[in-house]
UniProtKB/Swiss-Prot annotation:
Cysteines joined through disulfide linkages: none
Subcellular location: Cytoplasm
Tissue expression remark: Expressed in roots, leaves and flowers.
Entry-linked Pfam families: GDI
GO molecular function terms noted in the UniProt entry: GDP-dissociation inhibitor activity; GTPase activator activity; Rab geranylgeranyltransferase activity; small GTPase binding
Biased amino acid composition, Acidic residues: 550-563
Organism: Arabidopsis thaliana (Mouse-ear cress)
Protein's name according to its UniProt entry: Rab escort protein 1
Amino acid sequence: MIDIPPYPPLDPSNYDLIVVGTGVSESVLAAAASSSGSSVLHLDPNPFYGSHFASLSLPDLTSFLHSNSVSPPPSPSSPPLPPSNNHDFISVDLVNRSLYSSVEISSFESEILEEHSRRFNVDLAGPRVVFCADESINLMLKSGANNYVEFKSIDASFVGDSSGELRNVPDSRAAIFKDKSLTLLEKNQLMKFFKLVQSHLASSTEKDDSTTVKISEEDMESPFVDFLSKMRLPPKIKSIILYAIAMLDYDQDNTETCRHLLKTKEGIDRLALYITSMGRFSNALGALIYPIYGQGELPQAFCRRAAVKGCIYVLRMPITALLLDKETGGYKGVRLASGQEIFSQKLILDPCVTVGLESLSSLTDQQNETLSVLVPKSMINKEKIARGVCVIRGSVKANVSNALVVYPPKSLFPEQLTAIRVLQLGSGLAVCPADMHVLYLSTLCDNDDQGIKALLSAMSNLISLPVPENRQSDSVVENDTSETKPILLWRALYVQELVKGEFGGTISSMPSPDGNLNYNEIVESAVKLYEKLMGSEELFKEETSPAENTTEEENDGGVEIED
């Protein structure tokens, strides 16, 4: 239970929009609505910004996961009652559903970690990076939120397998020629494929495309994996393209278990995002960047932009009930944990907020219709994502600090149905102390056991557990390639439910963090909802001045995000 400090009454008590939760989608929406001139109240029950996209210290991450994991069902809600000060409304109690399950947290070097625990900024929804050309960057530039966040490059990307070998992802002409793991034939095949993709992309932007080679419409509608086979690419190259560049999750060669068989046109779009991200910013080493101090900086950047435009922020303030019109059933406002009643035209809610089923039985059809987006819906195929966070001493790859590792389906064990992604981040990003790294792991799964098994397999492939009888800080274990594996100091494993956003007329619910590596779908959900709320009004129509749209980045390799 969150202790609510005494708050003075909010003034005003009427707004155009109330937003609950400071995740990425909610924060983008609050910033956009504030920029359009709407009055916005932005609340969060937590004492920090970011909600499920927050970056936290180790103690705070531990506390959040335990307090928000699956717990016994709450006692039945009391029936809706009219607020004491206005009998034209009824109040409907809200409850929080748990997004997390199978939470397991282990510490192997407690004294060292306790000494440095507040020097960690650990992502709750990792691994996640930003493509230099993705929509989140475009929105940051358009809104001016880029003034409040700094980035650094991801140094390298690798593909892993059960042998423990990490192979570089050949994602550019220079990388292909430098790659010693590819034969001359494979290099030529990969270069030919990339040239075809670039020619196709060029033909779609040029008026006179008679001299460019274009992929046929028939091929564009075929499965991407079949198109790669048609191009006579060997399995190793196909795997790199599918899972380490296009960033697919499911085994594209197994139609029985693949839930999303990608078409070639979608695959080309994914490759286009990767290709256009390479070199977009002069001091970015590759396609991927990451915010200094953690991904929690992204929602905070949009919150700061919203505050400049007049949005009012209150943390540590849950809402406890919705206020509905007794006659029409329409939404009118919310009751805060402080007891104050606040009114608005529209309401946007965190994915955890829902109504107890017991509360619905005594409501009218109109009232139930208003609340329909908040009623938990059973899903036939309930997809989840298993996440892991590790603090390690050492690096998974010598002389590399910030790196992405992808394990394609079946690369670690035969039953591995989905790709496993691992992101290593170092102290240069201000996420951990020097000489340590933070690893984030994730994989889609149908159930908790399946997901945790996959994560543990990737962990054992990359890192070594300390020997219980000899937990000396400098102890290391050698792998089969005579290289030393990093030592695990701390670990968190958990499974997160994937909740889709529900868009209603006056009440909408935002999605939970998804299973993607980037923010495109998360940002897209905010853009779609904004269009429904504001109609044809342009998102962030006010342009920032050139001086305001530039970061003052003069330090250790930071990436300047500017037009």
